[in-house]
C-alpha cells in the first residue's frame, strides 16, 4: 500500500513518535551540533527503527510537486523490517475512546480556525479551518480556504476529535532558521469533540512516554 508523502525528520517528530516504537520512513534530517535540533544524530542515539533514503523503497508519484511527491510502500517497509529483525509488535498503551454523542447532545461550535505565525507572508495559504457537521459528528478540514482532499480516496479530510496542543517555541539561532519545540512536560490543550469545546492540559513525562490529555478536572479526555 502507498504511504506518503515522505519528508525530512525533525527533533520534535522523534519525540512524538518514540512512544509508538514505529518504523520511521523519512528522507533527510536536521544535522546540527545542537542536541535539541540534531535529528540526524538522535535517530541513531534513540535507536529509532529507521528506513532512510537508501534503496529502491521510494519513488516519485509524478503528480505532486516536490518535495511533496515522494512515496513508499508499506509492504516494502515490512519486508525491510523483517530483514532487520524488527518483527515484534510494540506495546502501546491506547488512548481512551468513547462512543459518539447522540444528536441531541451534540454542540453547535461549528468552526475552528487556526492561523499560522504572522512571520509567514503567504496571505493565509496554510491557515487551517475545521468545520463541524452535526449529522456526521465530524470536523472537515480546509487549507487556505480550500477543501483539503485526500489524493487517494478523493474525499475531504475529516476527524472526530481535534486537539490544539500548545507547546513552547524558541528559535535555534542556526543558519537554517530551525526551531525548538518543547514536547516533553505539560501545557495547555483545547479539545473539539462532539461540537463542543473543552480545555485542559497535555502531559508527556519522557521522550518514550505517550502524551496524555486531560480536562481541567484532571480526567483523561475520551
Give, region by region, the residue ranges found by the protein language model.
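A surface/extracellular/periplasmic glyco- and lipid-processing/surface-interacting theme
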Residues: 2-222
Amino acid at each position: 500500500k502507498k504511504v506518503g508523502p515522505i519528508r525530512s525528520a525533525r527533533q520534535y517528530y522523534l519525540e512524538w513518535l518514540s512512544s509508538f516504537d514505529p518504523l520511521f520512513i523519512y528522507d533527510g534530517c536536521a544535522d546540527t551540533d545542537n542536541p535539541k535540533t540534531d535529528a540526524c544524530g538522535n535517530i541513531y542515539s534513540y535507536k529509532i527503527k529507521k528506513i532512510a533514503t537508501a534503496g529502491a523503497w521510494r519513488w516519485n508519484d509524478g503528480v505532486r510537486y516536490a518535495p511533496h511527491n515522494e512515496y513508499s510502500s508499506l509492504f516494502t517497509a515490512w519486508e525491510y523490517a523483517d530483514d532487520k529483525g524488527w518483527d515484534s509488535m510494540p506495546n502501546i498503551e491506547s488512548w481512551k475512546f468513547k462512543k459518539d454523542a447522540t444528536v441531541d447532545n451534540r454542540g453547535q461550535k461549528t468552526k475552528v480556525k487556526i492561523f499560522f505565525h504572522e512571520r509567514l507572508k503567504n496571505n493565509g495559504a496554510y491557515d487551517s479551518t475545521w468545520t463541524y457537521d452535526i449529522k456526521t459528528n465530524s470536523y472537515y478540514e480546509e487549507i487556505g480556504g480550500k477543501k483539503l482532499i485526500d489524493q487517494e480516496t478523493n474525499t475531504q479530510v475529516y476527524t472526530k476529535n481535534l486537539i490544539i496542543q500548545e507547546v513552547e517555541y524558541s528559535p535555534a539561532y542556526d543558519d537554517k532558521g530551525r526551531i525548538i519545540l518543547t514536547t516533553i512536560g505539560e501545557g495547555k490543550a483545547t479539545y473539539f469533540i462532539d461540537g463542543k469545546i473543552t480545555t485542559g492540559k497535555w502531559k508527556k513525562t519522557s521522550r518514550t512516554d505517550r502524551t496524555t490529555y486531560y480536562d481541567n478536572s484532571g480526567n483523561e479526555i475520551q
